[in-house]
Amino acid sequence: MTDEIRPDPNFHLYLLVGQSNMAGRGKIDSLSTPNNPRVLMLTEENKWIVAKDPVHFDKPRVAGVGPGLAFAQEMMLFEKDEKVRIGLIPCAVGGTTIDMWQPGKDAYKGQYHPYDDAVRRLLIAMEDGVLKGIVWHQGEGDSNEERSKVYIDKLEKLVNLFRNESNNINTPFVAGELGYYMYILV
């Protein structure tokens, strides 16, 4: 018999979803080494380890530094309770459109099922901790004029789907975006 409480209310989970800007393609350097044993990540095999870049595993040959680890480290700077740990649930898939993030949809000829895979990993992680937020960084795949007109509506529906899966309609949602550029390449 153990005294461990599951899910642990001091294990704060963050679902990391989107495309390559979330997954990360940046060069790994000395700043990318694990430095906080209270910041963990869920591996592709669904095991918790100390977080390190690359956090995501969607495309191992190009995986690199993304915003996930920096986000968790920044969150820890403001956490006063020494019992709190952060668990990152990496689920981004580079090159996906928001339509590929709908239930039952796939990407790359069935290699990935972005939404379904994310929900499966989220539910596994929630056996150990409590979802505190969803971090989304996607949009380049939907940046043309036609797709961008319906993007916000689709994103709102997706957010609500994730919130329903976590049984908390008030789960905070953070969306990253790219800078606006006043030129067009021709």
Question: What are these regions, as identified by a protein language model?
Answer:
Residues 1-186:
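Cell-envelope and extracellular/periplasmic
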